[in-house]
Amino acid sequence: MPSQAPGPDVLENPADLLRQTRENFSIAHDLQLLNATEENLRRLMQRTQQLEAKGAQELSELQAQQTERAQAAEAMRAEKETQAQHLQALTHSQDLVRLANELEELEQQLVSLRAELDEGMTQLLQTSEPTAAFQGDAEHEQQSPEVQTNLLKLQLYSSLGVTLDTEHNQALIERGDAAGIDLIALEDDSLSPFFRTKYVWDRL
């Protein structure tokens, strides 16, 4: 590096100017500066790479944690949905059991009412005086109690507005509100005795 400006005599002699210029520069010092600068750049790049690697690792860990939390939240949501479905199914099952029990009780009551009705008709037939219609029938005394009970049932149904159509195996029900006549099949396996009885009584 130059330490001082060349004097007038040196400018007049170019050879002396070159020699003096070489003497004023320190190559060793400049090499040290270059080496130091290169070392600083190397350390700076190394530190930058370390920070980048650390940042990338932390970002990867954060992404992994976020993925795990999202999966855990989805699993909890699915579990809650499954529990809700199980609870709903259990509630429906309990309702079905309750309705089945109620239906069974109603059918038992229907059977009991039928038995009481048959017994009452039989007693009425045994204790009542023969009607005018049966007095003129010579074969009435030959009829069995079952036939007599069935005849009494037919009379009762007829008095309530129910007519049996034996030709078509159906019952004709005259509605109590004078809205017309309803029909119900008597030999339809898809209809239970409970349904038939309820259907008839609802329309009387």
From Swiss-Prot:
Location in or out of the cell: Nucleus; Chromosome, Centromere, Kinetochore
Keyword Endoplasmic reticulum: no
Coiled-coil features, chain-numbered ranges: 29-127
One Pfam family cited in the UniProt record for this chain: Spc24
Keywords: Cell cycle, Cell division, Centromere, Chromosome, Coiled coil, Kinetochore, Mitosis, Nucleus
UniProt-listed Gene3D superfamilies: 3.30.160.430
UniProt entry tagged with the keyword Nucleus: yes
InterPro entries linked to this entry: Ndc80_Spc24 (IPR013252), Spc24_Fungi_globular_sf (IPR038066)
One of the record's GO molecular function terms: identical protein binding
Record-linked SUPFAM superfamilies: Kinetochore globular domain (SSF143026)
Annotated signal peptide: none
Biological process according to GO: cell division; centromere clustering; chromosome segregation; sister chromatid biorientation
Any one Gene Ontology cellular component term annotated for this protein: nucleus
Protein function: Acts as a component of the essential kinetochore-associated NDC80 complex, which is required for chromosome segregation and spindle checkpoint activity.
Record's subunit section: Component of the NDC80 complex, which consists of NDC80, NUF2, SPC24 and SPC25.
Similarity-based family: Belongs to the SPC24 family.
Protein name: Probable kinetochore protein SPC24
Organism name: Eremothecium gossypii (strain ATCC 10895 / CBS 109.51 / FGSC 9923 / NRRL Y-1056) (Yeast)
